[in-house]
């Protein structure tokens, strides 16, 4: 169980508060953009070298459309659908923020130094709670703050775009793999 799973569970057990679904969900108010903004960021995860299928963006988008059109699938109640979408969006947000900050590779599988173990920071409940507070205060700013800000990381993102434009060859696969490994290492936070 990850820190963000613990925080997610604790939040919904202790509070009766929605982050994503509110009165504006079925109206034309701008606040509806929050869920759509989250789906935008999740849908563009490939800019970080992560498989775009890592998050269930299409599934969540389809469920949001069901809510907006009040067109429920057979056997699904509105309450259940709202709860599912709320939970999925919050779980995806916490996973996204924590993994962009501390890395997608599980800590037990990291070999950051073959001779000396270099201690790494991990996503803890304090960070995950702060991420929820940030989401509550200003969702769009929270999404932007979650993005890695290192100039080296941005350079690697530019290089990834360039390499992806080369097509598929043994050379590009080799180069892309090395680039993806270095992008992951750049996300790690050293203690």
Model region roles, listed by residue range:
Residues 1-191:
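Auxiliary tRNA-acceptor-end handling modules of aminoacyl-tRNA synthetases
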